[in-house]
Design a protein with these regions (language model features):
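Extended alpha-helical targeting/anchoring segments
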Residues: 1-434
Length: 434
């Protein structure tokens, strides 16, 4: 975990809103905006464009990171690992809908420190002259900042893959398998598609999501004829490069927000009191503990917090925190591979849950995969790609796919799980169609 053998340049600049800087770069290839809720302590956002290199890997033997070195996984890197890349060990080959791994490394990156109210431009190069030139490039991005405006709804409709009865039947079948002892929990999802209006762009969806309510792990990324928009609340992994401390924060348990404060508080209290949701959360905590134990120092993995309530603009969640210390013989790729795909969006046991998911869903693509950043100090932050839409440009039009799922356990009610998916897709539906 390093600067990849490069020299680093750092300059401090006056504040500018990251969404405005991203708007000035949005149409450039490799444009990336990682937008964090400024109300969260220590939150930082990142903007960059024009990567020095980008790679796309499909069905790599040995997993999505096979053949990559720690030098490849260095500061200034953005990557996207698709869910199917990690699930293939359980499901076997399935039709490819998205690359296993997309990565790009940037020679410059803007870091927006919301607490300090300042922007740092980081530049990397093989020598001081190249690093300073990269910083100069980053400064030009700031001068291109522009208001993102208020884009109109970019899609006429969001079309479900199947009617509600198909999902109700799938949940019923999974509940039966759980009661028969095949597994304990599985996350079963529904899918929707749309085609953007001819003049619309995925960045319009990102702007509408961001203006509708900030998320801890908001993201927009454009690479060629593909783009990703995410409004994820969930942390998959962080790794502090200096201390080697690892943290994961799985989410399990959801209730809708309500405009009536009394009902909203009642919904949150109901979630906290729910034995079903707490059991569901605990199963995933145990799974993540086991995953981290494969690459962390013996005895270092512990549960720091169980069933903490977290309130977002559209939902209440239960979040738990698990930490550990990465063993010296392991690096970033080992950590991600040991715990990917995230347990919160598979189920338990993970291998069996992924088989059950494949029996009821088409390939997921980037949804429920992970978007990850290695920042200026090569610290890893990886989100879980829920509340996420993927875009592919076909004959000049952007085609959209998104999903929403629910954790199914032995006492799940199919109608309630269906309603939960509607709550979870709500923000993306409004961003796409109004």
């Amino acid at each position: 975990m390093s600067d990849g053998g490069r020299i680093r340049c750092v300059r401090t600049l006056d504040w500018c809103e990251p969404l405005e800087v991203a708007a000035g770069l949005a149409m450039r290839d490799g444009a990336i905006c990682l937008l964090s809720d400024p109300a969260l302590p220590g939150s930082r956002s990142f903007v960059a464009a024009d990567p020095e290199w980008a790679v796309t890997l499909d069905e790599a033997e040995g997993g999505p990171f096979a053949g990559l070195t720690e030098r490849d996984l260095s500061a200034g890197l953005i990557g996207l690992a698709s869910y199917d890349a990690g699930a293939r060990v359980a499901t076997g080959p399935r039709p490819a809908v998205w690359p296993d791994l997309m990565m790009a490394r940037y020679s410059a990156m803007l870091v927006f420190d919301h607490d300090a109210g300042e922007v740092r431009v980081i530049g990397w190069g093989q020598d001081a002259s190249a690093a300073n030139a990269a910083c100069d490039l980053g400064e030009t991005w700031m001068t291109a900042a522009t208001s993102p405006g208020a884009p109109p709804p970019p899609a006429p409709a969001l079309i479900p893959d199947a009617d509600d009865s198909a999902y109700l039947d799938a949940v019923g079948e999974v509940v039966a398998r759980i009661r028969a002892g095949d597994l304990f929990q599985a996350n079963i999802a529904r899918g929707w598609t749309a085609v953007l209006d001819p003049q619309a762009d995925p960045f319009d969806v990102f702007v509408r999501l961001a203006q509708g309510g900030a998320a801890p792990y908001g993201a927009f990324w454009r690479l060629g004829d593909r783009a990703l928009v995410s409004n994820s609340p969930e942390l998959f992994l962080t790794l502090d490069a200096a201390s080697r401390r690892v943290v994961t924060r799985p989410i399990k348990g959801t209730r809708p927000r309500d405009p009536d404060p009394v009902q909203d508080a009642a919904n949150a209290a109901d979630l906290l009191a729910s034995a079903k949701d707490r059991a569901e959360n605990l199963m995933i905590v145990d799974l993540m503990r086991n995953d981290l134990s494969r690459v962390c120092e013996a005895g270092s993995v512990r549960v720091e917090n169980l069933f903490a309530p977290e309130t977002l603009p559209t939902v209440h969640h239960l979040v738990s925190t698990v930490s550990g210390r990465l063993a010296l013989e392991h690096g970033v790729a080992d950590l991600v591979l040991a715990s990917f795909p995230p347990g919160s969006i598979t189920g338990a046991p993970k291998h069996q849950a992924m088989k059950v998911i494949a029996a009821h869903e088409p390939p997921r693509g980037p949804w429920c995969g992970s978007l990850f950043l290695l920042d200026e100090d090569a610290n890893l932050t990886a989100s879980v790609l829920i509340r996420t839409a993927s875009f592919e440009r076909v004959e000049g039009r952007w085609h959209v796919r998104t999903q929403a799922g629910a954790g199914i356990v032995a006492d799940s009610d199919p109608a309630q799980e269906l309603a939960e998916t509607e709550v979870k897709i709500g923000a993306l539906r409004r961003a796409l169609t109004g």
